Amino acid sequence: MNKNTIIGFILMAAVLFGYSWYVQPSEEEIAAQRKQDSIENALRQKAEIAQKNELKAKKEQAAAAAKGDTTALFYQALNGKNEQLTLKNSKLQLTVSTHGGYVSGAKIMGFKDIKGDNNLTLFSGNEQKLNFMLAGKQDNIVTADLFFTPSNHTDSTLTLTAEAANGGQLVLNYRLGKNYLVNLQVQAKGLNGFFAPNYRQVDIEWEGLCRQQEKGFTFENRYATLTYKEKNDDSDYINETEKVTDEPMEFAIDWLAFKDQFFSSVLIPKGDIAPNSQLSSIPQEKGSGYLKQYIAKFKTDFDPTGAVPTEMEMYFGPNDFQVLKAVDEECSFDKDLDMQQLVYLGWPIVRLINRWFTIYVFDWLTQWGFNMGIVLILITMLLKAITYPLVKKSYMSSAKMRVLKPKLDEATKQYNKPEDAMMKQQAMMQLYSQYGVSPLGGCLPMLIQMPIWVAMFNFVPNAIQLRGESFLWISDLSTYDPIIEWGTNIWLIGDHLSLTCILFCVANILYSIMSMRQQKDQMVGQQAEQMKMMQWMMYLMPVMFFFMFNDYAAGLNFYYFVSLFFSAAIMWVLRKTTNDEKLLAILEARYKENKANPKKMSGLAARLAAMQKEAEELKKQREARH
């Protein structure tokens, strides 16, 4: 990278920051925009409320008409008492409403909520609904309108029955397992004549509000998605925007998930979710207590004879990799669910690192009962031990170039003009070749470490084991740790300062200074001048990291801080244990050996030599013309 390129990067960064600052609205403009936004939000909410009231009125009118229609098939089930019945085990407590027959509440045991309660409420009241709509020849059955009669009610089982006038029944059977799965069977009995002969699919509407469960609204919102798994493919999610997202799915789907950062509601039909399902994600206002509203409209298999019930499993639980992996074994359906994909582990190569290394090491350390902060430190130490040979190789390559610097200065002092840059480079490469030193020897090992850095970037924010865990001054490793907070949002910063983010950025600056000093000792001529420009970019990166990571999990910032500390310690130890005189003696011996038995130039050196020869020929031709 030459001087002009570095200056170009710095200027581009300056232009971007300058433009961002310039276009930033003034306080008056912000106030005016807030007022305008408030007006628009009020109008939008008013329109939404009016639309909802209109739909509600139509439904109530239709329900009232149905209740008054004594000839309706399920006339008797249109009136009744709404009871909230409980299913529970040691990990999950569900509430089932007899009006509509759906799971109206889910409480996950052993996980604290944002208010500090020991059991987390995933949803309650009208926050989530599941509605089955069965189309008949002359009439429709809508489970949301029906009152079901409960029977066979235990902690793990519940049968809900809606009686038809002709003696037929619509039966919902719930069966709660030992963990987070509940099985639901929907069966029509004695209703065969009600449906058309070719009726084979039931329409389902699943709607839910995603609660804000964590402290940071913006950070948690990034991981709240309506996720689905395409049949015979990987999972995906509908694109998130600030506006309503409504996407038709033109393919069959294995399961749907209303996903939050650490918890999910998942619906898994035994049959496929038919193509052309409609999925919607509606962002909610900050401060409302909700992140998004999810709506899924789809079809799945239905047997009107009642011989085979429409069956599905519902998962209400944590986004824990091992727990989700076990769902494949617990689920009785013949499907490859891969629900562990709800825990995002990064791009393919990064996912492999997290899938086959990070998770197992993390779980192994966790089972010993260590504090999660200690676990992060131990993982850092293990990763540093694994990558130590690469780091040492990189350092030794730099050390060799450092001890050869006087010889490089001597060999290249005659090439001071800009037009001599190619000759200077050739002289340096020739000297490196004679001493058996590769100038690129320190680059590849460092590049190999990058996937590990990115892997932890994806793993830590999704590790539910860090949720609610404290360490030192950090009250919760899964969210930011504010050293100071204020009520208003400041551009690029937010409404707080994270202490671990500050420590990470300060450590980054100190480590950059340490690295730059070491690299300066091995630079020659123009390279040394370029290094002066490069150091400003190195100082700029921590500033950019501050704006990026101020809202991130304290556990991630703490990991990067500890990682930089160990990197600096390793570099210091290597510097203290490297004897420059002995290293130079080894290189001199290699120089004599190579001089006595010259080796063929490497590919890079050969190409540079060819380029040098071509440059010299062109120079001679230009001089001959003049």
Model-derived regions: residue spans:
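Helix-loop-helix
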Residues: M1-K56, V96, V186-K189, E205-E220, ...
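Short, Gly/Pro- and small/polar-rich lid/capping loops
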Residues: E48-N82
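Soluble non-transmembrane domains of integral membrane proteins
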Residues: A77-D338
